[in-house]
Amino acid sequence: ALENVIEANTLLSGLGFENTGCAGAHGIHSGFSEIESAHAYLHGEKVAFGLLCQLVLENADKKLIDKIVRFLLAVDLPVCLADLNIEASEENLGIIADHTINHNPLIYNEPIVVNEVSVKNAILMADMIGRSYREGKYYL
């Protein structure tokens, strides 16, 4: 069994290298990293909430979003801006969206047209969804 895990890990590492498997979540993570109050959080924590933002940006199925939010909560990963110590101010959203769109090409791996407005809106909607789940008031 261990050999199978090692072999699968090696295979997936090679496949991941081919396209890095990176898109919106990593692009948005990069924007979060521009906010000083979020510097204490780990890469994976920022990508976790970035994934929720990506799903909103892609207009993903509500059942998938529900499943992801519940998983993130179960493993104590961020589901809203406050979980990353980021205030949802226009200034912060502008910094995040600008960096995501203009300084990190990963966002352009998304199969949709993205711009600063769509990124800001996705972050705000993901934040609202995450906060509602965290408060026990399910949005979906």
What would you call each of these model-derived segments?
Residues 60-140:
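C-terminal charged capping/lid subdomain of soluble metabolic enzymes
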Residues 1-74:
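Active-site segments that bind and position negatively charged phosphate/pyrophosphate groups
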